């Protein structure tokens, strides 16, 4: 295993710049997830690390060795793709050992590595089978096993769970997380699914339009997003937003006024805020409370109620707010579409964003950070 460093890395196709000035440090043995919407450049960046795409400018290092001009086959990387890429006419043993056989490795070493990988992935009893007899989850484990057999310095996984159904995705992400702990290797995982990112990563890299929007631990990004994009992307359901007017400003708190004239203090860094500004207030659906518990409250008309048994999600239409406000609470809630509904906003759970998307630093200390 090795560390991976990107310094001012750019990737362009003609005049179209995809990856833009990416600076990133990935420690040896770290599990890092690249996450972002479609077209943000996450897979392109992974392919640049693998050597499948040339870097237009900037530097890529594995440890202290510059890798820009090193061929993919000499980089010591192993890739797992969304497509399993298994040979249908070969059994599992031959699929997993194919690369080693091409390299003319010793037969005893091949057998040792394949059996070891099969034991780790619980595939030992299936090695004589062909891929067509396996489930989607088993096929993906074979693809991962093939990478383990090659003993790479860096594992690169490009949306490996996208072809699986919801239940299998949950199972496989647990297995991949266990695999990382078992092998202790450097892993870089690409996904558009922020739930996968939050549950698997030691560190998340959020990409937006080719730029790195924020890097941090999952709970850091959840509780302390540095901009509105990260705030809206991380978390499901996504964060609620509403426009507010700045009434008063102090160094460690800001008084905001909502569209219905209610004013309250928010504990955020006020040194970059100006009285009279229009800003955006954010609050997560799960952080809304009953009207009586909040520092202020909002009232609207219920549009949709999603009753999931273990929780209820209420979509509330508010005047002067573009999108429905979402209120999320555990268990069940007796409310129906068309009802008038009031919820409370706890000031210490609020986020405040400038018009350009920059976040004001929250001063409330969340547990576990």
UniProtKB/Swiss-Prot annotation:
Residues 4-234 form the ABC transporter domain. It is an enzyme of class 7 (translocase). CDD domains: ABC_MalK_N (cd03301). It is a peripheral membrane protein. It is found in: Cell inner membrane. Pfam families: ABC_tran, TOBE_2. The complex is composed of two ATP-binding proteins (MalK), two transmembrane proteins (MalG and MalK) and a solute-binding protein (MalE). This is Maltose/maltodextrin import ATP-binding protein MalK. It comes from Photobacterium profundum (strain SS9). The lineage of its organism: Bacteria, Pseudomonadati, Pseudomonadota, Gammaproteobacteria, Vibrionales. The gene is malK.
